[in-house]
């Protein structure tokens, strides 16, 4: 079921023009930057987007412009764990498996979960309760089980479903932000 939802959602995203995506994400970013969770955050955790993911570069640049610390994930496939590390310049990045851009350990510092004020959690599709279908690695679900801060996800309306399959270890995000609205999932 998850793989079918992933496929359906990625097909819908592929059908959008670059202009559509740009217009929709600009509205989404305005919602994000207006949230108290964003405005009060000193440290933001976010991925470096690629492919059909919601572009995160504008989010990173806005955070830097506002003097916020940005941290990005470093995945450890051998342990299936993830950590967040500081990110200030592109020379701190390296291309790893599957073409992902991740922080270079020697050029960055680890950020403890308790230091992250707001985490922007990626996903392929979501339901209105904040549950998500990711890319299948389980890294975020494992990390979120130990993270107590605020979480939001950025998505287009075509990525939103009434229900997505969930497992007992799945953890919902607090808020979903689309091009049309902010959905508070739970408190």
From Swiss-Prot:
Q: Which GO terms describe its cellular component?
A: cytoplasm
Spell out the InterPro entries in the cross-references.
FTHF_cligase (IPR002698), FTHF_cligase-like_sf (IPR024185), NagB/RpiA_transferase-like (IPR037171)
- UniProt record, GO biological process: folic acid-containing compound biosynthetic process; tetrahydrofolate interconversion
Q: A Pfam family name for this chain?
A: 5-FTHF_cyc-lig
Q: Which UniProt keywords apply?
A: ATP-binding, Nucleotide-binding
Q: Where does ATP bind?
A: 2-6, 134-141, 170
The molecular function GO annotations come to: 5-formyltetrahydrofolate cyclo-ligase activity; ATP binding
Q: Of which family is this protein a member?
A: Belongs to the 5-formyltetrahydrofolate cyclo-ligase family.
User: NCBIfam families per the record?
Assistant: MTHFS_bact (TIGR02727)
The record's PANTHER family line, in alphabetical order, gives: 5-FORMYLTETRAHYDROFOLATE CYCLO-LIGASE, ATPASE INHIBITOR/5-FORMYLTETRAHYDROFOLATE CYCLO-LIGASE
The protein depicted here goes by the name: Uncharacterized protein YqgN
Taxonomy of origin reads: Bacteria, Bacillati, Bacillota, Bacilli, Bacillales
